[in-house]
Amino acid sequence: MQRRQLEERQRKAEIEAQKDAILRTILTPEARQRLTNVKLVRPELAEAIENQLIALAQSGRIQAQITDDELKQILAQLNSQTRKDYKITIKERGWK
């Protein structure tokens, strides 16, 4: 049981190391820092961006490093697609 958990942790660590190495080559240091900040606030959004960037890099569609400004544009596009609008309606008030 513990051996399986240890192997699982090691496998996840290896995958994260590979992802980090790829992101290091395709992102400028400023863009990497921004992605790290996003990961702290919205981990699911950062994960989606990381996976998308890695897929683009592996398919050869990224020719130069992605700058901070380009990452901002990507974040804005994904944020507008995944943004949820909340509407609060008050049915009854406690005072008259």
Curated annotation (Swiss-Prot):
Entry annotated with the keyword Repeat: no
One Pfam family recorded for the sequence: dsDNA_bind
Entry keyword DNA-binding: yes
A single GO cellular-component term on record: cytosol
TM ranges: none
Keyword tags: DNA-binding
Entries under HAMAP family matching the protein: dsDNA_bind (MF_00026)
Family membership noted in the UniProt record: Belongs to the PDCD5 family.
Listed name of the protein: DNA-binding protein Saci_1468
